[in-house]
Each structure stands twice: as structure tokens, then as C-alpha cells.
Amino acid sequence: MIATTRDREGATMITFRLRLPCRTILRVFSRNPLVRGTDRLEAVVMLLAVTVSLLTIPFAAAAGTAVQDSRSHVYAHQAQTRHPATATVIDHEGVIDSNTTATSAPPRTKITVPARWVVNGIERSGEVNAKPGTKSGDRVGIWVDSAGQLVDEPAPPARAIADAALAALGLWLSVAAVAGALLALTRAILIRVRNASWQHDIDSLFCTQR
């Protein structure tokens, strides 16, 4: 099938060709005696698998949009309620220096150290992440919420797009995988049926010749 788009003045803008699976459709509805019932069944299952996969695309896109909206609100709330602060390491004995780690162990990029920080005039303490070799009295950057509690760094807003893409792609791939698995299972069963039919015909032929 050839489709052509034109502008308001009638000038040709774009011409493209859309190829439809005519052979598969004709196989389903053909009355050719050479087309076996198993062939028609396989063609029907194939069409159903392709149709389901295509129909899943708009639902996957809608799911991705919903995930993006939801995650965007979450990340925006994190950006508004989480703030950077500075904590002071308070216990030297709990700090592991990078030179004391075992030589066979992989190098560590972060360690956990006890520290304290002040937010809105209230002093708090807890375990924070720091670089190896951090000593007592050193200052490390942390993130806290509006109540001064230690939290993770807020996620960048662009992550919502990645989450949406992964959700949409994951949904579509799941449905397509199930459809493909059912098609493969159907083909395997039909191959066994065809082989059994061929064997039956061959056995019947030998019996007739005797």
C-alpha cells in the first residue's frame, strides 16, 4: 500500500510504502487444499502474537507517562525538602584509614563514620558516608530533610524520564516475551503433530504396498 501526503496547495510532501503481511493473512483464509490445518493455526497464532504486541505499545506508553508524572512529583518534592549540610566526624577510632585495608581487598571509595551536624539550632548525630582516610574533626558533606534527619541526595529530575522509559519498555517486553513464548510453544507442538502425521502416512503407505 502506498500513501502520499500533500500540503494545502496540493504539492506532494511525503510518499511512503507500507507493506502488510498479505501472505500470512492469505494463508489463514486460503482454501488451498495444500495448506494444512496446522499451517492455518500457526498463522493465526502468529497474527495474534503480532497484534497483541502492537496493541500493547499505547498501553506501555500510557504506563510510562504515568510513571513519569509520579516520579517527577517525588523528585520535585525531594529537591524542595532536602538540603545540603556539613557534618563533623566525632570518633577517630571508628574511622578506617585507607592504608590499613587488606591488600587483597578491592580499594574502598567510601566508608561509614560517626558524625554530628546542626540544623536549625538542633544538634543531631549518626553514621555518614566519607572518603577513606577521614579523621576525627574532618568535615563531610551530607543531605538532610526539613527536620534535620539524614537522607540520601535528591535524585535529578531527569531520572523521571529514564524511569518512564524503563517502565514502558519493561511492560512491552514482558507482553512481547509472553506472546513470543506462546508462539514458540505452539510451533513446537504443531511440529510434533506434523511429524506424527507424516509418520502415520508413511506407515500407511508401507502397509498398503505389502
From Swiss-Prot:
Induction profile: A member of the dormancy regulon. Induced in response to reduced oxygen tension (hypoxia), low levels of nitric oxide (NO) and carbon monoxide (CO). It is hoped that this regulon will give insight into the latent, or dormant phase of infection.
Assigned keywords, A-Z: Cell membrane, Membrane, Transmembrane, Transmembrane helix
Residue ranges crossing the lipid bilayer per the database entry: 43-63, 165-185
Statement: the UniProt record of this protein carries the keyword Transmembrane: yes
Keyword Cell membrane listed: yes
Membrane topology listed for this record: Multi-pass membrane protein
InterPro entries for this protein: MT1774/Rv1733c-like
Record's protein name: Probable membrane protein Rv1733c
Organism: Mycobacterium tuberculosis (strain ATCC 25618 / H37Rv)
Technological use: Has strong T-cell and IFN-gamma inducing capacity in human tuberculin skin test positive patients, indicating this might be a good vaccine candidate. Has also been seen to serve as an immunogenic antigen, inducing gamma-interferon responses in whole-blood cultures from M.tuberculosis-exposed adults in Uganda, The Gambia and South Africa, also indicating this might be a good vaccine candidate.
Compartments (UniProt record): Cell membrane
A GO-annotated cellular component: plasma membrane
